[in-house]
């Protein structure tokens, strides 16, 4: 199609999708006008987190449309967080600032399973419900709801896919996001538990981004030390994309990644 016709068709498709999703919202649930949703993410950069933000913004638009809120009554949303998932201090400081503004609800994804305890308690004391997404916290009694992947199952599925590819014997490396993140912990646990059924498979290296100075160089070093490596499990977008960007030479072990970025899809 000519560009102008293609753009028009795409616009109509998007509009139709928005109308459908808005019509599915149960408006019998009471929502206060001018409600403020504060989102503090593990990170703001990266394809995965940009998609998370887009999904949240679309949901807010759908709610405002379904409830027919006027411009003065509309629900609003802010989306903040560090640019890097490993910047735990910035996330904690952002949570402090956001809670001080007393939002209607706080949504967060925890970079460190333990680091946000004081902030969760402060939110609870101020009557601010907390919804956690992607990566949970240790004290879920302070959490109203959690929405995320079954991370242990994701790890199990990754192990099964590698076994399908390499058979029941081989050497595996695990390249993971920060060890203190709940999603990373569960994915690695699920992966290891699934591989425990195969005596001929060994995990020869286990790296975490918060345990090495340069993750890219650390992964490259593993490939040099184990030229006969059979498989690699990368637990999130950042690590998977970083690994795919390495010069692996003739050594091309099977790789399974999480988050399905465009880089991973292109590699497949």
Kindly give the residue locations of the regions a language model identified.
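A residue-level marker of the well-folded mature domains of exported/periplasmic proteins
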Residues: 1-268
